Amino acid sequence: MKFNKKILMISAATLMLVSPVTSLANANTVSAASVKKVSYAKQTTVTVKKKTPQLFMATGGRALTTGKYYKKGQKLTVDQLGGMNILANSSPDAYHIKGTDYYVWAKDVKAKRALQDIDYTSRGLTTVRTNKSKAPLYSFDAEKSTPAGYAFMKGTDFKVNGAMYLYNAKTDKSELYYHLTNHYHTMANLKTSPDFPNRFNTELVDTGDAFVKASDVNFFSGKKLKPINTAASAKDGSKIAILENQEADLKDLLGKVDSVKNSVKYKLSSSLKRDNYDLAVRDAQTQGNSRKLMSTAEAQYLIWRLKTYESELDGAKVKVGNMNKLTSNEKLAIGLLVISVYGKNTDKESLYGYAKFNKGNDKTFTLTIKDMHNQKKVVSTKTMKISDFAQKR
């Protein structure tokens, strides 16, 4: 792959991170002395108060049991505490047992020290919320890129995985933006919603790779994102040709795409995460093969996207006790993984894939994929090896 090293002008935009404002009801004054600071431990010992099941986490943070139990009085070293999905309105807390793939219900143990409570399914994720109707989307050059005829409602939540300054050559300004993690979003169809924003009809829309301006959103939850660059570097980098080390990094990242796609972490990631990685690869390949001049700012961004989306691939096989004798919960865990891998919801199709296990056969299952937009018509059926989705614990 060859990159043209001539100077390229790339526009971008800058944004200030907006933090939610917290107010005290009735203007009450709280003194510093009255606020007790909690010191959380990185790990602690818990003592089992009563016989309690050994848990493992399936796809979607689903809590399932292994069939084994912890005994009353047993001591365990734990290093995380968080809510687990039990298909109910609540997500009860469970401790992760250090050095294992197992968990134990928090209510059934007594902890020596406090651990900070996290959300297992959303840890590492960041959500921002629009503070106005019709908040626009932007491309890397800071030009508005909202699909024509569509708009976001006030209060729309976005999963974002990066914050960066982009330079807009037309306005000669750098502003900060959040990078949207996914490229499919629910939007109001303005053509069929004449009373927007009071009433509206929505559709799932492919917005492509996009940003939202920080001033148009408020931080909602998750990890605070630190910008990967500065306003000055965004402007300066748009006027400097791609650097040799950046060219080498891009070649290395694109050179290992086949290896990534053949890995378990890719194959067993959700279809959404695979699509996100695929889009980052396609965009980097397109930019690298085009005659368009590439700047160091654009190269930095393409490298960041490839590394970020590869790191978000999290596919893994279900760990089971006996590959020749699966428990009902182990089969359920495999089934949940299959749904995540083969389910797909885009602006063009809605597919649902599920596993059917045959009695007395723990070697294979039948994968069925249905088109949910076409009266649940069966698209395909295929015999799959369980060993491609599970491994001995």
Regions found by a protein language model. Name each.
Residues M1-K37, R393:
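Gram-positive Sec-dependent secretion signals
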Residues P20-V21, N26, A58, A114, ...:
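Short acidic, gly/pro-rich beta-turn/loop elements at beta-sheet edges
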Residues V30-Y177, T181-L204, A214-A241, S259-S270:
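Beta-loop motif signature
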Residues K75-T77, V109, Y177, T364-T368, ...:
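Generic alpha-helical hydrophobic packing signal
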Residues V104, A111, P197-F219, L306, ...:
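A short, surface-exposed beta-strand/turn
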Residues I228-T364, K370-R393:
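Beta-rich interaction/scaffold domains
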